[in-house]
Structure formats: structure tokens, C-alpha cells
């Protein structure tokens, strides 16, 4: 893990950027593209990518990364607890719908065994489940997904913070 900024620093930077006209959507695109570039730079063959997404902005970053990786001819599978059209956050839902239109493959609410089998095929897994706003106890399905991911032995790139850990 390579921490760069703490949560309060991130909030200050985001507020400053929005004050000078950078939208939250633009920030999400930048984060998603940066995550995709980082994944591609991890070394070795990066052709099969699994992205575990949550329902908030961290998940939105994952959907943007999925679209970017798909455009680089990676086989991308996004694992999500809900259908893209059912995501409640407007921005994350828009990013999910856009990624689906771009041809990103989606797996909704997999069983434990389905997830274990999928993770075994991944060259890299992007963890975009829970971001810097997370605190408290991890709830289903993310508790199961985190357990499967930790036991998989897969190479993992966490966006913002490893899911389940408090950034506070």
C-alpha cells in the first residue's frame, strides 16, 4: 500500500478542485483512468481483469477503469451487487451504464463459488468496493467478497483504500 494523502487532505483537494471548476465527474474519470493505467503497469500479461465495485463513487471509479481497460483490449468483468440501472448514486450509475454500452461484461451478485472461480482467472483484480468514506462493519456482500479476494492469491490494486479498512 502506498498512501499519499489522508482523508482530510483528499477532501481539501477535492473541494479546491471543484471551486476552480473541476467537476466530480471529471475527478471520477481521472481516478478511473489512473487506476487502469496503474493496473496495466503492474507487469506481466494483463489481459483478464476483474473489478469488484461498490455502489458509491469508489465503484464509479471502477466502472471508469473497466471502460478504459476494455478500450485497451483487456477482457474485463465487473462484479457488482446490483444491476447497473439499479445503482442509486447518479454518477456511479451513469458510469456503470456507459461501461456496459462500451461492452464491459458484468456479473451481478455472484455466489461465493462463482466469485472464487472468477478470481482464479484474473491477472489483476481492482478493488473498488469501499472507499475513503467507509467506516464501521463491512456488510454483505462485501464481507464475503473481501474474504474471497484475500484468499484468492490474486494481484490486487485497491482504489483509494483496501476495502474494509478505515481510512480515518
Residue ranges and their predicted role:
Residues 1-5, 43-52, 57-168:
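Glycine-rich phosphate/dinucleotide-binding loop and adjoining beta-alpha-beta core of small-molecule
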Residues 1-47:
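Positively charged, low-complexity intrinsically disordered leader regions
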